[in-house]
Structure formats: structure tokens, C-alpha cells
Curated annotation (Swiss-Prot):
Keywords: RNA-binding, Transcription, Transcription antitermination, Transcription regulation
Family statement: Belongs to the NusB family.
Name of the protein described by the UniProt record: Transcription antitermination protein NusB
NCBIfam families in the cross-refs: nusB
GO biological process, alphabetically ordered: DNA-templated transcription termination; transcription antitermination
MF terms in GO: RNA binding
Protein role: Involved in transcription antitermination. Required for transcription of ribosomal RNA (rRNA) genes. Binds specifically to the boxA antiterminator sequence of the ribosomal RNA (rrn) operons.
Pfam families: NusB (PF01029)
């Protein structure tokens, strides 16, 4: 008998979830630090995705999915932000939101628009769970409400 643990392969869904989380972190870093998309994608792919940092091992992430979200949000931000702003309550401006919440919403809305192969429920659930990883209060509810409103506008399956 061997004492070594056998590594189970990470399921594709888990790799996509890890890619979504990494994309939100990268978008946050770009928003706060002013880092460019090429630099941030290279940094994450070389030093973060599936790597050990400060004793914590990051889940293996689908690098293509990560790249698609980050570059897609940057490319389509002028289309994403008005949709998000319209889905917020009247007294809230997108600029008033926490940078992390903005990153979560932008990534989620990008997937709703661009990844028609992924069910709405999967996208909304994944990004609400990401919000729950960062916030205990009302932010996950806000993410859920905004993504749900936008999904009903842009996806026929969510209109039911």
C-alpha cells in the first residue's frame, strides 16, 4: 500500500469555476491597479492558475475560459456597463459599487451575452457564489438580482 495521495482530475466545471474566480480577481486588480489586460493575463497564467502561493494551492483553472472572460470584459465593457447600470436600482450608479462587485457583475454579464452554451442558472449561481466568497451582507443578493434582470433581457431561456 502506498501513502501517496492519488490526485483526482479536476472536473471541467470546477476548472471553469476556478477560471471565473480568477477572472474576477484579475478584473478587480485591473480596476484598482490600472494593470493592462495582456500583463494581467500573463501574470495569472504564469504565476496563479493552479499554482501554490503563500502555502495555498489555487485550483487548476481553465486558462482559455479565464482568458475569454478577462479579455471579453475589457473588449465589451462599453456594452456591459450600460446594461448593469440599467439593472441597478435608480439611486445606485455603477461607480458607487465596490470594485469587486463591479468585477463580478461585468464577468457575469459578459458570460450571459457571450457564452450562450452555458445555462443562465449556472452563470448566475457561479457568480453569486463568488460574491459570497467575498461578502457576507447584501452584495450576493445584489449580484443575483442584477444578473437575473439582465438574463431576462438577453436570454430567452430566462424569460420563462
Amino acid at each position: 500500500m502506498s501513502d501517496e495521495k492519488t490526485e483526482r482530475p479536476v472536473k471541467t466545471a470546477n476548472q471553469r469555476g476556478a477560471a471565473r474566480l480568477a477572472a474576477v480577481q484579475a478584473l478587480y486588480q485591473m480596476d484598482v491597479g490600472g494593470t493592462g489586460v495582456l500583463e494581467i493575463v500573463a501574470e495569472y497564467e504564469a504565476h496563479r492558475l493552479g499554482q501554490e502561493i503563500d502555502g495555498a494551492t489555487y485550483l487548476k483553472a481553465d486558462a482559455g475560459w479565464f482568458r475569454s472572460i478577462v479579455s471579453g470584459v475589457v473588449r465589451d465593457q462599453v456594452r456591459l456597463d450600460p446594461l448593469i447600470a440599467a439593472a441597478l436600482q435608480d439611486d445606485w450608479a455603477l461607480s458607487r459599487l465596490d470594485s469587486t462587485v463591479r468585477a463580478i457583475l461585468r464577468a457575469g454579464v459578459f458570460e450571459l451575452l457571450d457564452r450562450k452554451d452555458v445555462p443562465v442558472a449556472v452563470i448566475v449561481t457561479e457568480y453569486v457564489e463568488i460574491a459570497q466568497a467575498f461578502f457576507d451582507d447584501d452584495e450576493p443578493k445584489l449580484v443575483n438580482a442584477v444578473l437575473d434582470r439582465i438574463a431576462k433581457q438577453v436570454r430567452s431561456e430566462a424569460k420563462k
